[in-house]
Amino acid sequence: MRSNRAKSRAVVSMAATLPMLAGALALGIPAAHAADNPGRDSLAGTKPAWATAKADKGATSNGSQVSLRVYLAGKDASGLAAYAKAVSDPNSAAYGKYLSAKQVQARFGATKAQVAAVKSWLTSTGLKVTGVTQHYVSVTGDVAAAEKAFSTQLHNYAKGAKTYRAPSKSASAPDSLNGAVLTVTGLDNAPHKANHDDQLPGPTAVFKNAGPFSSYYGSKTATSLPSAYGKKIPYAVQGYTGKQLRAAYGAGKYTGKGVRVAITDAYASPTIAFDAATYAKKHGDAKWKTGQLHQVLPGNYTNTGADECDASGWYGEETLDVEAVHAVAPDADVTYVGGASCFDDDLLDSLSKVVDNHLADIVSNSWGDIEANQTPDLAAAYDQVFQLGAVEGIGFYFSSGDNGDEVAHTGVKQVDTPANSAWVTAVGGTSLAVGKGDKYLWETGWGTEKASLSADGKSWTAFPGAFTSGAGGGTSKTVSEPYYQKGVVPNALATANNAAGNRVVPDISAIADPNTGFKVGQTQTQADGSESYSEYRIGGTSLASPVIAAVQALAQEARGGKAIGFANPSIYAKYGSKAYHDVTDNPTGSGLAVARVDFANGYDATDGLLTSVRSLGKDSSLSAVKGYDDVTGVGTPADGYVQSFVKPKGHR
């Protein structure tokens, strides 16, 4: 279940494409002088691709109000990107030479003089400064003042069935600021939110799984149901536990001791401490120590309604993330950083809190949106935070999405964001088979096709059925191919959208299929209106991301506690080794499927049962093949992965 940075962002025109994030923006560098506007520096990417002449519906009223964030470039934006790369590259002399948060701010942050100059410019145009952080200056005002400040005209544009405001040309800033401005967000008012990637309903109402179940893969065969792929198939597992996942991914003796993991989502579950403690006790996980689970929360929440961000729907996301990390890395410290809403500005604030205060070395993020909805100005703001984190030795892990190639969901083949950033680790998903005695059997790329049981119970209707969900992946249309993917990612994938090569997602993977999912425990509203703790099986790349974050905590412990930092160069350096399970869609040589029984009403048998067959390894147009692929990346952690971080005796 992955939290989408915005359910309502699906109203965008799916035909929209974004300019390539190359050169200045890709590195977080302020754009060059505007040739058509002397004395101004263009802020590239501030005019959305959907703001076309054909869609133009006329000028926005001068009196309309705007709320903007002017992001600061800092003293040395190009130097920040270069240092972030060097400190993360195992082949660099600077590898692992991280800076403290204070050192990062002193070396790369905006100076007091830069901030003062930006504030002076903004107020001189009639905008009102409403807040200042080390990353941005927030302002409000009317359209006329914004147009004056950024030397552009704001028009209304048709975007799908909606109308939104946007600049008619790229915004700019005075060149007298000497590049102090990175970008500005808020000139366009299309929704910028995230969705969580859960595959099951949120905790507002109870959800329970019906049986029969397998306790491990294949333990209970559906003998009374029709065959699939020429054989009887097992019932879906009840939900794997931490013990099974630790065995599958080679945890060994490591527990994440001494390692700090952060989780970002929107809002905060009011019952997380109780739920996490109850779950750990019921499933044999280590008891949470006093102070081991922290929460860093905003003073106020916004956009909480069901038609906005649906705050309660995010509670299950936090629950899954916290319980999954603790199940796999039971001694790691966990800090949950909640956003004030599911909008990008608030999620960026959460990420910045982690970096500015170095709350953790490993950050799991189970939320995102489609690439067509991310504008380059936001991408620049995100990348700046990711680069600052890399310099401190902080790595960010993002779920790759739950809709496969997104065609069934949006009508357009595309990847998700921020997982598409070259500065984060995109985590894809698999279907996992753990057998008797916690033995790893196999994995497939996660992609599900569903067919229902016929009325007479003798066949599966229209077998194998329709695509329901699967790991997000594919080739970005906006992000250039990063150096660490060259030589590993097949050329056919890298050049799918551009002969010069683009970023391909994901980088690495873990369990995600809800049909081979993880059991979680959460306080839910029961059918009678009471609230009580109950458990259910869940999946999505929302599960894969915290599992990989937890495995990274084990790896960091194995290397003596030294931060792994931005992990992609290291992940690709281990490609083709015993560190990974090389996942394919057909690991057993024949079709794979499980039988699943669900309550029709989602919680009990009052309204009957629904029986279906779920075929595995059917991820839309994406395929898990031998070697790197766009479903699972380099693969999943094998027994050799954590062990590969152990330094030989005598090695310093």
Where are these regions (language model features)?
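Tryptophan-centered motif/residue detector
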Residues: 314, 367, 442-448, 456, ...
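Long, domain-scale functional regions
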Residues: 544-545, 577
